């Protein structure tokens, strides 16, 4: 039980780091990459990380949907979220030219 909580906390940190990096990079067409990367990193923590990534991703997309963001873009974000959470390489979504720092 304690390991699940630790994994969830660390997974939430991974999600925040990906979000912060996305804002810092401010790189065109990079949002799907950062969605996939945050979910990928969180899921590597274990079941708690997977849970945290799913809850955070669903909440974020739900809020953005309420704010009038397009359904198609939200669905594409969720696909990138699932891709990363499933352990697939987030670089699949990496845009050309994004600095190696990310």
Swiss-Prot record:
Record-linked Pfam families: SAA
Gene Ontology terms: cellular component: high-density lipoprotein particle
Example GO BP: acute-phase response
Function summary: Major acute phase reactant. Apolipoprotein of the HDL complex.
Span list, region Disordered: 68-102
Name this protein carries in UniProt: Serum amyloid A-5 protein
Source species of the chain: Mesocricetus auratus (Golden hamster)
Cell location: Secreted
